[in-house]
Amino acid sequence: MSDPKPTRSQGDLAEMLEMLLDKGVVVNADIAVSVGDTELLGIELRAAIASFETAAEYGLEFPTGTDMERVESAANISPDQSDPASETQSETESTNPLSDDSTPTASTSAEETK
């Protein structure tokens, strides 16, 4: 009898990771721990996973200290395209497939912050 062989190659994982970072994905998770009818613990998780280049294209928020010039040059976008204050809410909603109503993004307009 022959030894079992893996059905997946390492290339599959690399390709999947490349696609995930290239396209991006939003993770929404609601976790509740209950005993009977009493909820003891509730966790709401909202996360966007994407490469810096993809996140810059869609206007997602970056951590403090991120070298924005490097991100903008890697994503081939101009600084005014990545500035969230320069976008309107309608432009953001129509061009941002990574976000939904419950997912926070950096693309807030000046009208939203007032």
Swiss-Prot record:
This is Gas vesicle protein J1. Keywords: Gas vesicle, Plasmid. PROSITE patterns: GAS_VESICLE_A_1 (PS00234), GAS_VESICLE_A_2 (PS00669). One of its GO terms (cellular component) is vesicle membrane. The lineage of its organism: Archaea, Methanobacteriati, Methanobacteriota, Stenosarchaea group, Halobacteria. The gene is gvpJ11. Changing D22A: Mix of cylindrical and spindle-shaped gas vesicles, still interacts with GvpL. Encoded in a 14-gene plasmid locus called p-vac which produces predominantly short, spindle-shaped gas vesicles during all stages of growth. Residues 13-22 are annotated as: Alpha helix 1. Proteins GvpF to GvpM might be involved in nucleating gas vesicle formation. Mutagenesis of residues 13-61 shows that almost none of them can be substituted and still make gas vesicles. A minor component of the gas vesicle. Gas vesicles are hollow, gas filled proteinaceous nanostructures found in several microbial planktonic microorganisms. They allow positioning of halobacteria at the optimal depth for growth in the poorly aerated, shallow brine pools of their habitat. Changing K23A: Unstable gas vesicles that do not float, still interacts with GvpL.
